[in-house]
Amino acid sequence: PGYDAMFSAAAETNQAISCLVNADGLPEIDRMCSVHPNVTVVIDHLGRIGIDGVIRDSDVDMLCSLAKHEKVHVKGSAFYALGKDKPGHSDLVPLIRRVYDAYGPDRLMWASDAPPSLAVETYEDQISLIRDRISFLSEMDRDKIMRDTAARVVFFQ
């Protein structure tokens, strides 16, 4: 009942809900989005897929399946805590590609997760994966992911 009240309030007040959940919480997000299709939802930190060091296809499948809900967005952030958690984060590129293919750049946004992230890596480590090193992203995609999507979704521009 608590989630239903939260989603109902978000629908009534035109607020976005930002969800910090692990992959096992994604089915509940799916259920709530089915009941409340007009609520804007942002899944933080790629659904924390790989938080234990393992990126499971079933978790990625579940995150990608949420793209059927037009108002669901995904934040690519906390790279330092996902997968092999090494700066460079190249092990996350296949995950990011699948999420990109499911959602497109208009429903993806980057975030640093600072200040916690700054305890383990530099800001450059955090930003460079999306900004510089993912070859399938166009400049327009990067602009959307790095700036435009968040501006539109979070600030309702």
Where are these regions (language model features)?
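Catalytic pocket-lining loop regions of alpha/beta-barrel enzymes
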Residues: 1-109
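Mid-to-C-terminal alpha-helical segments outside catalytic/metal-binding sites
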Residues: 98, 102-109, 118-157
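Active-site glycine-centered loops adjacent to acidic/histidine catalytic or metal-binding residues
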Residues: 113
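Short, active-site-adjacent cap segments at secondary-structure transitions
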Residues: 81, 116-118
